[in-house]
């Protein structure tokens, strides 16, 4: 029995080394089919370079309507459909029209038509329009009621939160980023956009990079839904970046305009660093990038200028 084995171990310790006795006890327990679990040392993943971690062969994809053949799907050409500048009220009106079309597509369980895609592409989000969520602002009373009744409670809270973190990226900025990537030698590959909004970076992908596979992630359900309707052949997951199933060292490029703000993301792997949201996106995106890959993200100057060097140290270690 195991008790007898332990008793014998105490006796033989006097005549043999502790190592030999332990080896004998292991054999005796094995004979009795008694499993011995060796403790697994804790590993600090944050200090392990992404390129030295195991690489999975693929990332989990998302298809809104897998039953629809690719030949019947439409990809919106953003480059040839400029969104004109407008005041807050007009931007609100465009947003509401886009939401109406999105809701119709979701109710009918279908993809948007090319005509509907033009309306959807006018959506610019709620960054810079906090008045639409202010119930005490009399000059926006009608808009407040219209928006509040058009969205579900979760959609409304997500939209209101985005007024502080989400901002529209002008096409000229996106084009400049792609040109810089081309100058760095990037031609095609797996591309991640960790906060894709309605997919403007996807829509502005240069023709020279069209063989690339883009994976988008977007926490805001409305923005993600519009992106899925505009870029019907692209995998876009409507979920927080911290919950997305994405392997390390997988992507050839990471692009996008990450959310800014004095808030933090709850991600067990990164919590110890206490990163602000934009720094968190930088750090996690870098871990998803393969060695030699290209990362081109828009962030605040604080990432490189702030007194706390935590995120810069994290980047340097990679």
What are these model-predicted stretches?
Residues 73-230:
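Class I S-adenosyl-L-methionine
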Residues 26, 30-72:
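Acidic, low-complexity intrinsically disordered tails
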Residues 3-29:
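A short, charged, amphipathic alpha-helix used as a generic interaction element across diverse proteins
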Residues 217-221, 226, 274-318:
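Conserved Class I SAM-dependent methyltransferase catalytic core
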Residues 233-241:
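Conserved SAM-binding strand-loop segment of SAM-dependent methyltransferases
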Residues 245-255:
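A short acidic, Gly/Pro-enriched loop at the edge of an enzyme's catalytic core
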């Amino acid at each position: 029995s195991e008790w007898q084995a332990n008793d014998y171990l105490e006796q033989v310790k006097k005549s043999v080394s502790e190592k030999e006795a332990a080896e004998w006890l292991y054999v005796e327990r094995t004979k009795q089919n008694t499993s011995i679990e060796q403790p697994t040392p804790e590993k600090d993943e944050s200090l392990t370079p992404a390129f030295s971690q195991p690489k999975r062969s693929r990332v989990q994809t998302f298809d809104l309507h897998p039953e629809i053949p690719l030949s019947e799907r439409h990809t919106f050409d953003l480059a040839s459909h400029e969104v004109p500048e407008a005041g807050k009220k007009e931007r609100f009106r465009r947003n509401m029209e886009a939401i109406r079309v999105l809701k119709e597509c979701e109710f009918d369980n279908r993809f948007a038509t090319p005509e509907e895609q033009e309306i959807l592409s006018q959506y610019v989000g709620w960054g810079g329009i906090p008045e639409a969520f202010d119930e005490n602002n009399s000059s926006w009373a009608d808009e407040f009621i219209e928006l509040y009744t058009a969205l579900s409670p979760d959609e409304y809270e997500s939209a209101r939160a985005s007024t502080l973190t989400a901002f529209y990226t002008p096409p000229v900025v996106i084009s400049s980023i792609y040109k810089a990537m081309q100058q760095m030698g990037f031609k095609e590959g797996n591309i991640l956009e960790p906060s894709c909004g309605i997919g403007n970076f996807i829509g502005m992908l240069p023709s020279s990079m069209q063989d690339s596979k883009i994976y988008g992630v977007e926490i805001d359900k409305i923005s993600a839904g519009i992106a899925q309707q505009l870029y019907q052949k692209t995998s876009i997951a409507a979920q927080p970046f911290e919950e997305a199933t994405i392997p390390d060292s997988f992507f050839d490029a990471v692009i996008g305009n990450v959310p800014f703000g004095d808030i933090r993301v709850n991600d067990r792997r990164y919590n110890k660093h206490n990163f602000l949201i934009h720094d968190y996106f930088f750090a996690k995106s870098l871990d998803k990038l393969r060695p030699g890959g290209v990362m081109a993200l828009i962030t605040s100057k604080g990432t490189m200028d702030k007194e706390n060097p935590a995120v810069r140290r994290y980047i340097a270690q990679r």
